[in-house]
């Protein structure tokens, strides 16, 4: 069993946190919005509301004690970059960042993300591939 800190509870973060917990891993889910935290609280090991841009919040959550942190917070480069940077400076062994563009990807890599994912782009590619293979009747 590994321990994961999932920051940002949009569609991707919520889905990931719930899936990791279902697989038997320890999951701490964090979001700035209390309502998102409440929605996922019953499906993960721990859930907390807090501003992950603040290193003191990350320290209080025990961020450095997790095996991996996944940053899916913020649609802008600055927010996710700051969170990734804070996590790396706190000593989190593996930090995964979610990017929305090639530039976002480069920024997260440059500041130390161990891995960067493009969930929206990967979903779009999968949908295009499926549409090319499956012809749905019009009607």
Positions of the model-derived regions?
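Cytosolic regulatory regions of ion transport systems
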Residues: 1-139
């Amino acid at each position: 069993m590994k321990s994961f800190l999932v920051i940002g509870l949009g569609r991707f973060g919520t889905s990931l946190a719930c899936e990791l917990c279902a697989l038997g891993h320890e999951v701490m889910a964090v979001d700035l919005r209390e309502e998102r935290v409440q929605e996922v609280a019953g499906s993960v090991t721990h859930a907390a509301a807090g501003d992950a841009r603040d290193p003191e919040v990350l320290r209080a959550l025990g961020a450095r004690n997790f095996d991996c942190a996944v940053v899916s917070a913020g649609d802008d480069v600055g927010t996710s970059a700051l969170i990734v940077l804070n996590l790396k400076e706190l000593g989190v062994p593996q930090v995964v960042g979610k990017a929305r563009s090639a530039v976002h990807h480069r920024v997260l890599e440059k500041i130390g993300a161990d891995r960067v994912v493009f969930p929206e782009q990967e979903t779009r590619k999968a949908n295009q591939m499926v549409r090319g293979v499956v012809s749905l009747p019009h009607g």
